Amino acid sequence: LDHNNLTRMPGPLPRSLRELHLDHNQISRVPNNALEGLENLTALYLQHNEIQEVGSSMRGLRSLILLDLSYNHLRRVPDGLPSALEQLYLEHNNVYTVPDSYFRGSPKLLYVRLSHNSLTNSGLASNTFNSSSLLELDLSYNQLQKI
């Protein structure tokens, strides 16, 4: 479903779905129930949309390993990341803060990309990225003065 003119999340979607490609559309939000029942989903591609809000729609995606929300208009990181998540791509948004202990619920997280956002030191707690599993952290092109 990528490279279309979708303005909202399609549905209902097959529960057996493993990958969902909705990139390069015009989707502006992901309603809380939009991904309900997609327990087998391992990869969700939502990059290059107009998404401003995700809400808690990711909570039930217990098999999700990859979430790509890059090139959107998010101001906040998504609520309730799945515990199986390994790759989180949020570059080229307007994210200005990451809550303290935000990544504690995702112990398998290996890659986090938050480059080209609006992050400042006041929007990041000093222990935000303390994770023994993290292999790559990209915070380039933000407004950080220290790490």
UniProtKB/Swiss-Prot annotation:
Q: Keyword Repeat, does the record have it?
A: yes
Q: Which UniProt keywords apply?
A: Extracellular matrix, Glycoprotein, Leucine-rich repeat, Proteoglycan, Pyrrolidone carboxylic acid, Repeat, Secreted, Sulfation
Q: Can you tell me which residues are glycosylated?
A: 5, 40, 130
Q: How is it modified after translation?
A: Binds keratan sulfate chains.
Give a single Pfam family match: LRR_8
What are the record's GO terms for cellular component? extracellular space
Q: Which PROSITE patterns match?
A: LRR
The record's function comment reads: Affects the rate of fibrils formation. May have a primary role in collagen fibrillogenesis.
Q: What family, per the record?
A: Belongs to the small leucine-rich proteoglycan (SLRP) family. SLRP class II subfamily.
Q: How does it assemble?
A: Binds to type I and type II collagen.
Q: What is the name attached to this protein's record?
A: Fibromodulin
Q: Which organism is it from?
A: Oryctolagus cuniculus
